[in-house]
Amino acid sequence: MAATTYMPAEMELGNIGGYHAASPRSAEPADMKYQHPLHSGGSPSPGAPVIGNPWTSLPPADPWAMHQHHAHAHQPDVKPPPAPHDHRHLQHAAHGWHAPVVSPHYGAARPSHCMEDTQCPCTNTICSETSSPRDPLHHHAMERDQPEEDTPTSDDLEAFAKQFKQRRIKLGFTQADVGLALGTLYGNVFSQTTICRFEALQLSFKNMCKLKPLLQKWLEEADSTTGSPTSIDKIAAQGRKRKKRTSIEVSVKGALEQHFHKQPKPSAQEITSLADSLQLEKEVVRVWFCNRRQKEKRMTPPNTLGGEMMEGMGHAHYGHGDVHGSPLQHSPPGLSPQHGLPQGAHTLAAH
């Protein structure tokens, strides 16, 4: 009896909503049939009776619903595209938006604040963008926080630089040795100045952060291989070999001095023959002559200037004595000729 009562209402609602009862559109599940009362309420008709939503009280075993499901199983889904349907929905909203009726078709992607706003009925695209979860924002925040955890602070860099300098000195390596070892082991060649500026915290924060892991790896390897000949020790030995000072014997140095007085600037052939005769390396002899010439330049100008000044002072002294008499005449009373000279000398001076 309930089915015969609702059949005319269903037919009338289907005709008012713009869809025939036998169309595939009406054969959709119940969540799409809530749109028919909305259209009937949005476009009032004088002869249409005002009734509630009959589909909400329809039992699951209703013959009409079973008939629609059976028709839907045999007929393809040819429902119209959503764009004209949205257009009709906006036209009905222009006539009057009486109550914020929640439609399952639109309420799934529409946020609560959009349903309360009667001035801006949102579409599915805009609502889906505004109702997007905050997980992407949280994800970006985590990405920004991740590098900050790995980036050392200025206090960490200062503490590591101090520790690195102490360990380097204790292990007996110079700053040049560390730079050479980094270039050989890790492929990044650093000068002694760079290592010095790192220890003094004079590099930029970005360069300090880049250099810290390399120095930390080198320090760990140096600590673990202390006491055994490794590649680091060989590299350090090569670095110290360049700074080795050559000690020359006294007899060899005398021969070099004699040759220097004869020829301060020997030619390449003379340097080679002299090195062979003294059993020295050619580079050692060449460097010795360079250093000896620099030493001569440092010593010669003061001696020359001093000799000229002494000669000038001597001429002025004698001229002063010729004009004003002997210096003995202007001597203090304690050193007067009467007290400082013998009697014979005083007699000769009187005559």
Curated annotation (Swiss-Prot):
Residues 61-88, 131-154, 314-351 are annotated as: Disordered. Gene3D superfamilies: Homeodomain-like, lambda repressor-like DNA-binding domains. GO terms for molecular function: DNA-binding transcription factor activity, RNA polymerase II-specific; RNA polymerase II cis-regulatory region sequence-specific DNA binding. It comes from the Eukaryota. Keywords: Activator, Developmental protein, Differentiation, DNA-binding, Homeobox, Neurogenesis, Nucleus, Transcription, Transcription regulation. Involved in the transcriptional regulation of sericin-1 gene. Residues 149-223 form the POU-specific domain. GO terms for biological process: cell development; generation of neurons; positive regulation of transcription by RNA polymerase II. This is Silk gland factor 3. It is found in: Nucleus. Its main location: nucleus. PANTHER family: POU DOMAIN, POU DOMAIN PROTEIN 2, ISOFORM B-RELATED. Belongs to the POU transcription factor family. Class-3 subfamily. Residues 241-300 bind DNA. One of its GO terms (cellular component) is nucleus. Residues 135-145 have a biased composition (Basic and acidic residues). Restricted to the middle silk gland. It comes from Bombyx mori.
